[in-house]
A protein has these predicted regions:
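N-terminal Rossmann-like NAD(P) cofactor-binding module of classical short-chain dehydrogenase/reductase
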Residues: 76-77, 103
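Alpha-helix C-terminal capping/helix-to-coil transition sites in glycosyltransferase folds
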Residues: 71-72, 98
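Rossmann-like NAD(P)(H) cofactor-binding subdomain of soluble oxidoreductases
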Residues: 88-139
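Internal alpha-helical scaffold of NAD(P)-dependent oxidoreductase catalytic cores
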Residues: 144-175
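Hydrophobic Val/Ile/Leu positions in short beta-strands of Rossmann-like dinucleotide-binding domains
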Residues: 19-20, 78, 152
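NAD(P)+-binding Rossmann beta1-loop-alpha1 motif at the extreme N-terminus of oxidoreductases
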Residues: 11-67, 71
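Glycine-rich, N-terminal phosphate-binding loop of Rossmann-like dinucleotide-binding domains
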Residues: 79-81, 106, 154
Length: 175
């Protein structure tokens, strides 16, 4: 049960369309868990063959190689390698809705926060402390985050409601 005030709990309830960019271990696991919580999940991947496999595995309701698939999302999770977070594709940045909450799941925080806080007004740097040695579209599974810490690293410019949504997200996933 959440210990957050009721008006802050609503932040989670009102947001129900998520985009997951990258459907490897972390992104794929998020896609499965978010769907189990009732979210509509849009997946974005780099290659068509990956999109087909991710869809076949049920990692998202829809999977695309076109960043425009994120246009209606309330939440976008960047499950990308650190190098791609630090130098994001301009088509991805341009496709992010300005009202969406955007977070990453990378293990490096300060450089990612520095880059993304300039790129999106509702960015929250975060990192679930969960994983396995597996990688790629075959690696994701339900329940990866249960019982695992999930940290957020806001700065003074972080939107408090965006931060609250990420905290609620982590709690809803069992972190």
């Amino acid at each position: 049960r959440s210990t957050w005030p009721r008006e802050q709990q609503r932040v989670m309830v009102d947001q129900r369309r998520a985009g997951v960019v990258g459907l490897g271990l972390i992104g794929g696991s998020l896609g499965l868990d978010l769907q189990a919580l009732g979210w509509e999940v849009q997946g974005l991947v780099h290659r068509e063959v990956t999109a087909e496999r991710a869809l076949a595995r049920g990692l998202a309701h829809q999977v695309s190689t076109n960043p425009s698939c994120l246009s209606g999302c309330d939440l976008v999770i960047l499950a990308l390698p650190i190098a791609r977070l630090l130098e994001p594709d301009s088509a991805l940045v341009d496709a992010l809705p300005s009202t969406a909450v955007v977070t990453d799941v990378g293990s490096v925080k300060a450089p990612v926060l520095k880059v993304w806080s300039r790129l999106h007004p509702r960015f929250v740097a975060s990192h679930p402390m969960a994983g396995t040695a597996e990688a790629g579209v075959e690696a994701g599974f339900s329940g990866l985050f249960r019982g695992r810490p999930w940290i957020a690293t806001p700065d003074s410019q972080t939107d408090p409601l965006a931060l609250q949504l990420i905290q609620n997200l982590a709690e809803s996933l069992g972190s």
